[in-house]
Amino acid sequence: QLRSALSNGTYGGERQTTSSAVSSNGGIIGVNGSAFDYGTGKPSPLGMCIKNGILYGDYMTSYSVMAVKNNGTIYTPAQGLMGKDLLAAGVKDTYNFGPILIKDGAAQLPWAETEKYYPRTAVGMVKPNDYVLLVTDTGNYSGLNHWDMVNIFKSYGCTYAYNLDGGGSS
């Protein structure tokens, strides 16, 4: 099951480590998902923000939104929808970063950053509620590029994959 959490349980709350967020939400593993902004001095998710069926940031959807439906399906909704539209469609969580790596089983490449190697965090869906999480860092390793991630997700049979916030967050 894929679940989400806000930093310390609040939108724009104090910064919280991933391990603390996992522990306080009864999780087993955790990763950072969405890009965030420190404009208020506290981390707030950028763009559309639905967490556990509650709408926090009601922005229009864009190409960079990943949605998780109540039935466990992960997808990127059409551009230009509002949060109320996603809630009505059964969306329980959204994430903002991107790009989409695989959609309907097909690679969604290339992009400007396709060939660059960075620390990465990404999620793939084999089928609803059957996910693959991918996290790399660059301690003694150059990281992954988008093609590498697509190939890894395809090897697990993912029909959808999405690049989450990586870099220092990974």
Question: Model features per residue range: what roles?
Answer:
Residues Q1-Y59:
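Zymogen propeptides
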Residues S24-G26, T61-Y63, N96, Y118-R120:
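Extracytoplasmic
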Residues F36-E113:
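Active-site-adjacent helix-turn-beta-strand microarchitecture at beta-sheet edges
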Residues Q1, N25-G26, V68-T73, P128-N129:
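Short, solvent-exposed coil/turn segments at beta-strand boundaries
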Residues I28-N32, V65-A67, Y75-T76, G124, ...:
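Structural recognition of the beta-strand scaffold that forms the well-ordered cores
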Residues A35-G39, G83, P119, T138-Y141, ...:
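Solvent-exposed loop/turn segments at secondary-structure junctions
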Residues T94-G98, I102-T159:
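Domain-core and long-helix interface of multi-subunit machines
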Residues S7-T10, A78-D85, T136-N140:
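Short, solvent-exposed aromatic-acidic interface loops
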